[in-house]
Regions:
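C-terminal substrate-binding/catalytic lobe of Rossmann-fold NAD(P)-dependent oxidoreductases
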Residues: 1-128
Length: 128
C-alpha cells in the first residue's frame, strides 16, 4: 500500500492505508478470517521505524510519503511474476471530504441509532 499526504500529516501509515491493507488481507484469507491474522506491517512507513530486511511471503507492506501540499493519494499494488496492477485514488481538493461528510450526515438522518462507518454509506449508495 503506497500513500502520499501533505508534509504536516502526523500519522504514517494513514488510517485509510491501514483500512485498505485490512481489506486486501481479508480478501486473501476470506471473510472473518483476517481478524488478528499476521500479514500487515509498517515496513517502509517511516525510515526511523522501518524494520530491516525483506518482508515475509504474503505480508502486506506500506510506503508513506509526506511532502508539500499533497491532499491525499492511495495506491494498492498487486504484483505477480512479471506483472503489476496499480489501483490509485488521488484527492485533488479537500472539498471532496466535505461533500462526503455531508452525504454521510444526510444518510444518517433516516437511520436508527447505532454505529456506522463510511463503508455503510458507500454500500447503501451503491445498492440504491
Amino acid at each position: 500500500v503506497l500513500e502520499m499526504h501533505h508534509r504536516t500529516k502526523r500519522d504514517a501509515p494513514s488510517g485509510t492505508a491501514l483500512t485498505l491493507a485490512a481489506a486486501a488481507r481479508e480478501a486473501r484469507l476470506g471473510p472473518g478470517r483476517a481478524s488478528g491474522a499476521p500479514g500487515v506491517s509498517a515496513a517502509g512507513a517511516l525510515p526511523e521505524t522501518a524494520p530491516a530486511g525483506a518482508r515475509r511471503d504474503g505480508e502486506i507492506g506500506f510506503a508513506a510519503v509526506r511532502a508539500g501540499d499533497i491532499v491525499g493519494e492511495h495506491t494498492v499494488l498487486f504484483t505477480g511474476a512479471g506483472e503489476q496492477l496499480f489501483l490509485t485514488h488521488r484527492a485533488l481538493d479537500r472539498a471532496i471530504f466535505a461533500r462526503g461528510a455531508l452525504a454521510a450526515a444526510l444518510w444518517l438522518q433516516s437511520r436508527p441509532a447505532g454505529r456506522y462507518g463510511m463503508g455503510d454509506v458507500v454500500l447503501a449508495k451503491t445498492n440504491t
